[in-house]
Curated annotation (Swiss-Prot):
Naturally occurring in which organism (per UniProt): Caenorhabditis elegans
Assigned keywords, A-Z: Cytoplasm, Developmental protein
Chain's role: Rac effector required for tissue morphogenesis, cell migrations and egg laying. May play a role in egg laying and in yolk protein clatherin-mediated endocytosis by oocytes during oogenesis. Plays a role in the formation of gap junctions between EA and EP endodermal precursor cells in embryos.
Domain of life per record: Eukaryota
Compartment list: Cytoplasm
Gene Ontology terms describing biological process: actin filament organization; cell migration; cell morphogenesis; cell projection assembly; collateral sprouting; cortical actin cytoskeleton organization; egg-laying behavior; embryonic body morphogenesis
Record protein name field: Membrane-associated protein gex-3
Quaternary context: Interacts with aco-1, gei-13 and gex-2. Interacts with gex-3.
Effect of disrupting the coding gene: Embryonic lethality with cells differentiating, but failing to become organized. External hypodermal cells fail to spread over and enclose the embryo, but instead cluster on the dorsal side. RNAi-mediated knockdown results in reduced egg laying and in defective endocytosis by oocytes characterized by an accumulation of aggregated yolk protein in the pseudocoelomatic space. RNAi-mediated knockdown results in abherrent inx-3-positive gap junction formation along the adjoining membranes of EA and EP endodermal precursor cells at the 16-24 cell stage of embryogenesis.
Lineage: Eukaryota, Metazoa, Ecdysozoa, Nematoda, Chromadorea
Length: 1141
């Protein structure tokens, strides 16, 4: 009957179900433990101050709680009973499920004990491992349960609320409360529960002895035996890797350690009397300072076992063994595991390289992959838990914490992931190999062994025969799960003591069957095998440690290329999920995505930072060749040659940072790396990391590291540009000179272009996108661009200082010069000479020039608007002057009217109307001259960069008349060519005067020109108006008036479309020349003649001549008809003579 019962109780099926359910229940317990420790997600009733008295009473009296006799204490509980039961029901019924699961587990263990099953991991592998896993699951589940701090409060509060609602306690509460009390000391209670079952545990652990002793060796033993090497026996390289205990070869040492320690501790009074088991137990204690309970919950081995043994009645003699093991582990364990990791790094690298080159070897040698992955995983999870727990348990002054730091761990992780990728990539190769192997070999040898087997019942014979037939006719659609379960059932049936067929007497059949089951897993369970041997989802529960690992990896150039292994590990996190705890899915998925995102982002930031440092070095080299740097060296050399002293020392100090090009390439020792060498090495390593994987898949999301890099480079590029603009000082008053800015920009672009050789990223597109955005007003993030910043500075600082008289525009030098009236914080020519403007154009591009031009012209239009307001005030007087320009008296009256000082003295710096008109005219001239200089720089750059485009444009432009040139004014401005009419000014004036009647506006425009013409003679009244031929400028910038007049006149009269620009300009010339001649006449009739007055009058003649010379609609012949040219010649002669003196 015992044999019949063994089949009827379905031991195999129950072991599968209960192990899975135990894993699910531990997931739920773990989730409850973490939730109760987090105030954000903790049930609010446990933190409610009104509930505090009831909870204290419950915990003190647990599990016997009388709610009715303590009605005052439980008054609030009764009031909130419905909410309490609803909120705590998940917690309570989870504990109830644990009670139910424990009962089922104990029932199965007792049943197997009563059937007197014979367990041997080398024969009935599935049955033995499932049994031991179930025992360990029971132990760890109870340990984890005992660590939930609020378990009594949760259960007691729920039961009290339930009792107050229904008048009786919840049905399972008495047994549940007793379980909580029993497992306050879980090891002690488990010793009582599992002690009677020690025979079966002894049988299982005894069979593990040989496997454990063979597997748990030092790295030196592994090296001697070439344990993971495919090339150790070249003649056997194409043969399938086979052993008699094939499934034990990749069995996790971490799992075996848990079997030995937990089972040996719980049943110490019997199991440890066996020398073999005691030796294994001691060895496990010597190799581990802590063991995994579940996820990041650990079991401090020596401390916990010592406390348990001391509390036992018999005062076990094993206490000294534990103390000796702890001393041994403290000295040797860390070093042994570190040596293993060193060996595994080289072994996995060799294995990975060989299999990548010859993926066909994955068929016969897949066992080596599982063995290597399993060993690597064991070492990684050992290191993780010890790095967290050892600092808390080690003695002060111990070096264990320092020895646990493994800077080369990322390399080990990288090769583990490489092997996983190879298995995934060549899934079909492995599957096809084992489909043929199973049908051509396994089915034959299994059939032969079945035929030779004696003592099989009909049902057992049918099961094995069907198994052999199925694998003989196997194909990719065969359901192999049923075959593996049949073999599991067979193990359970034939392991019972009274079974007629004893598997131990037919070892050959067991070996062939176990081998065949392993081969079947290679066909349809490769993903499960990967999870079993190399799942590192444990990293999910050590987020701070993981972050520390990948940050340290980035800081070490030799390991930097492996940093994305930590991003790829995030894909493992979802394997920690269980169907019995669905509420964890969102949280763990979010953690996986966050880690992957953080690793890639931080790696890209590090790469960008290194690029910045390399670019700084490149800029330093480029700056050495600039004239300013060369001048410093030359001056220093001259000063040092002339003598010694403070001056020579200061010169030497100034030149110390400068070195001749080529010096950076000198080497004294090839082992000595310079900082640029180190930066370049790190750059290449991180580039290799980011370029190794085009995409990373994590939790149904796809991450593209190169896309991250492109975005990071773009962001860093913008930050660097802004940092360079203000020379690293965000609150600086003056930006970097355009030439230096361009030099720095070219240095960074050179570095970026060099990066393209290290990683396949579209650097050109990144640079084009970024630089193109920097030519606009704002970038894609709505922040100011370099073009906007330069435009703002030139308008609000440079040109504003110029309009205040602090600068002079030199026509000869084509730049702004300091007038010397006030000390400036910058040299104007450092920002406005042709070389600087050409550099500026290259930085901001045509779009930036267009932006700056529009802003400049907007200011011009604003000045014209202000002048129009003055004209409107004196409209009648100007009408009279326009019609009586040949009447000297009336013209003089109008000029005097415009020259009257304002009566309102409250306004500071108030001037007369004439001076206001002239001042605004000069400002307009300055802006227009600067704008033309900017266009000249643009034209020069276009000619050098796009000669064919420029030639085509010139050919078109020179064959157009003025009307057509005006029509393509915007295009010509983009090429740096100034047309007959400034169309941007026309549009700006039209935009600022939308509601004025056209005829009225036309009249105002005519009167504005009249007003300027009448006021021009006042220029000669200032000593600062003297013209200096050496710089072709006046100190008050009055030489800018001709440009202003021509620009205003052409724009205003083109706006009205009456085709009278030439007539209006002749009218202006007549008014201006008559006014100047009248002034000459008044000067000649005056008795007092001053040289200063004469010099200032010469400026008027030059202004008149330059206005005509630069005007498209006037000629010298027209000037000659209304103004004697000999005055102009005399004026130039006098100015040159005065400047020479």
């Amino acid at each position: 009957m015992a044999y019949k019962d063994a089949r009827q109780v379905k031991i195999a099926e129950k072991l599968v179900i209960l192990n899975d359910r135990a894993a699910g229940m531990m997931t739920r317990i773990y989730n409850i433990k973490k939730s109760s420790g987090d105030s954000k997600v903790k049930p609010q009733f446990l933190s409610d101050k009104k509930m505090e008295g009831a909870i204290k009473h419950i915990v003190r009296k647990f599990p016997v709680v009388d709610c009715r006799s303590n009605s005052s204490t439980f008054e609030y509980v009764q009031e909130k009973s419905t909410e309490i039961t609803k909120s705590l029901s998940l917690y309570y019924y989870t504990f109830a499920d644990i009670l139910d699961l424990k009962d089922h587990i104990m029932q199965v263990l007792t049943t197997m004990e009563s059937c007197q099953c014979q367990l041997d991991v080398t024969l009935n592998y599935d049955l033995t491992t499932s049994y031991l896993n179930l025992v360990v699951h029971l132990v760890t589940m109870m340990i984890l349960l005992s660590r939930i701090e609020d378990r009594k409060a949760v259960l007691g509060l729920f039961n009290a609320a339930y009792d107050l609602q229904h008048g009786q306690s919840e049905a399972s509460f008495p047994r549940l409360g007793q379980m909580i009390l029993d497992y306050e000391n879980p090891l002690k209670k488990l010793h009582e529960d599992l002690g009677p079952l020690n025979r079966l545990i002894y049988s299982a652990l005894s069979s593990v002895t040989h496997t454990y002793q063979r597997r748990n060796k030092t790295a030196d033993s592994w090296r001697t035996s070439n344990v993971f090497s495919l090339t150790a026996a070249p003649a056997q390289i194409l043969y399938a890797a086979q052993t008699e205990t094939i499934a034990c070869e990749y069995l996790s040492l971490d799992v075996i350690d848990r079997w030995i320690v937990f089972c040996g501790t719980v049943c110490h009074s019997t199991l440890l009397n066996d020398d073999n088991i005691r030796h294994m137990w001691q060895l496990a204690l010597q190799m581990n300072l802590c063991l995994r309970v579940f996820r990041d919950e650990t079991f401090i081995v020596h401390q916990e076992i010592q406390a348990f043994l001391e509390s036992s009645k018999e005062k076990s003699k094993r206490l000294q063994d534990v103390k000796d093991a702890f001393n041994h582990a403290s000295v040797t364990a860390v070093a042994v595991h570190a040596d293993r990791r060193r060996f595994l790094r080289s072994s996995l690298r060799e294995l990975s390289l060989l299999l990548r080159d010859q993926p066909g070897l994955l068929g016969p040698k897949i066992l080596y992959v599982w063995m290597a992955l399993g060993a690597g995983r064991d070492e990684v999870i050992w290191l993780l838990r010890h790095q967290v727990e050892v600092p808390a348990i080690s003695k002060k002054g111990s070096r264990m914490v320092e020895e646990l730091v493994d800077r080369q761990l990322p390399e080990l992780l990288f090769y583990m992931l490489e092997l996983r990728d190879l298995v995934t990539k060549y899934y079909a190769v492995i599957q096809r190999y084992y489909l043929q192997y199973v049908s051509s070999y396994d089915s034959i040898v299994v059939s032969e062994e079945i035929n030779q087997a004696n003592g099989l019942t009909q049902e057992e014979a049918v099961l094995l025969t069907d198994f052999a037939n199925e694998i003989g006719n196997i194909n990719s659609d065969t359901d192999l799960r049923a075959l593996r379960l049949d073999w599991f059932r067979f193990q359970a049936w034939t392991s019972a003591a009274r079974s007629h067929f004893q598997l131990s007497r037919h070892k050959k059949l067991a070996i062939y069957m176990n081998t065949s089951v392993f081969h079947l897993k290679m066909i349809d369970l490769q993903d499960e095998m990967l999870r079993e041997t190399s799942d590192l989802s444990l990293y999910c529960f050590y987020p701070k440690l993981a972050e520390k690992h990948w940050l340290n990896c980035l800081q070490l150039p030799a390991q930097a290329r492996y940093v994305l292994s930590f991003a790829r590990l995030a894909a493992h996190f979802t394997s920690a999920l269980h169907d019995m705890c669905p509420e964890e899915k969102a949280f763990i998925t979010e953690k996986a995505l966050a880690q992957c995102n953080s690793v890639i982002e931080e790696t890209c930031k590090q790469l960008s930072y290194i690029l910045e440092k390399v670019a700084e070095h490149e800029f330093g080299l480029a700056y050495q060749m600039t004239p300013s740097a060369v001048a410093v060296r030359v001056v220093a050399q001259v000063v040092q040659q002339k003598g010694s002293g403070k001056a020579a020392a200061a010169a030497a100090a100034a030149a110390r940072d400068y070195f001749i090009a080529g010096e950076e390439s000198y080497r004294v020792d090839r082992q000595a790396l310079t900082m640029p060498d180190k930066l370049q090495t790190t750059l290449l390593e991180i580039s290799a990391a980011l370029g190794a994987h085009r995409q990373i898949y994590v939790a149904d999301h796809t991450f593209a590291p190169r896309t991250y890099l492109a975005q990071s480079l773009e962001t860093k590029f913008v930050e660097l540009l802004h940092g360079m603009f203000w020379e690293g000082q965000p609150h600086a008053s003056n930006p970097k000179r355009p030439s230096e800015m361009l030099l720095a920009l070219q240095a960074y672009m050179t570095v970026l272009q060099n990066l393209d050789t290290a990683i396949s990223v579209d650097i050109s597109n990144t640079m084009q996108t970024t630089l193109l955005q920097q030519t606009q007003l704002v970038d894609s993030k709505n922040k100011d661009t370099i073009a906007a910043l330069y435009t703002k500075w030139y308008l609000e600082v440079l040109l504003r200082r110029a309009s205040s008289g602090h600068m002079v525009w030199s026509e000869h030098l084509r730049t702004m010069l300091s007038s010397g009236q006030e000390q400036l914080s910058f040299m104007p020519d450092h920002y406005s000479d042709p070389q600087e403007l050409r550099a500026l154009v290259q930085i901001i591009g045509p779009y930036g020039v267009k932006l700056m031009t529009e802003r400049l012209i907007w200011h011009v239009a604003s000045q014209i608007m202000e002048m129009s307001k003055i004209v409107a005030t004196y409209k009648d007087a100007l009408q009279i002057a326009r019609s009586n320009f040949d009447n000297a008296e009336k013209m003089k009256d109008v000029l005097n009217l415009l020259s009257v000082e304002p009566k309102d003295k409250k306004t500071p710096n108030a001037t007369c109307a004439a001076d206001a008109i002239l001042q605004r005219t000069i400002i307009i001239g300055q802006i227009c001259l600067f704008r033309d200089a900017l266009h000249d720089a643009l034209r020069h750059i276009v000619e050098s960069k796009l000669p064919f485009l420029q030639a085509s444009f010139d050919m078109l432009y020179h064959n157009l008349d003025d009307v057509d040139k005006v029509k393509i004014g915007e295009m010509s401005a983009a090429m740096g060519v100034t047309g007959p009419v400034d169309m941007s000014l026309v549009n700006a004036v039209r935009a600022q005067n939308p509601n004025i009647h056209p005829q009225e506006h036309y009249v105002n425009s005519c009167l504005l020109m009249v007003a300027v013409a009448i006021c021009i003679p006042r220029i000669g009244m200032s000593d600062l108006s003297s013209y200096k031929p050496s710089i072709q400028a006046s100190l008050n910038n009055s030489h800018c008036v001709p440009m202003a007049i021509n620009t205003i006149g052409s724009a205003l009269f083109h706006l009205h479309e009456q085709n009278d620009i030439q007539s209006r300009m002749k009218e202006f010339l007549a008014l201006a020349s008559s006014g100047i001649l009248r002034t000459i006449h008044e000067r000649d009739n005056s008795r007092q003649i001053s040289d200063d007055v004469l010099r200032s009058h010469t400026t008027l003649y030059i202004i008149l001549e330059q206005m005509v010379r630069k005007n498209r609609w006037l000629s010298m012949d027209v000037l000659e008809t209304c103004f004697p040219y000999n005055l102009v010649r005399t004026a130039y002669q006098q100015c040159y003579e005065a400047d020479a003196q």
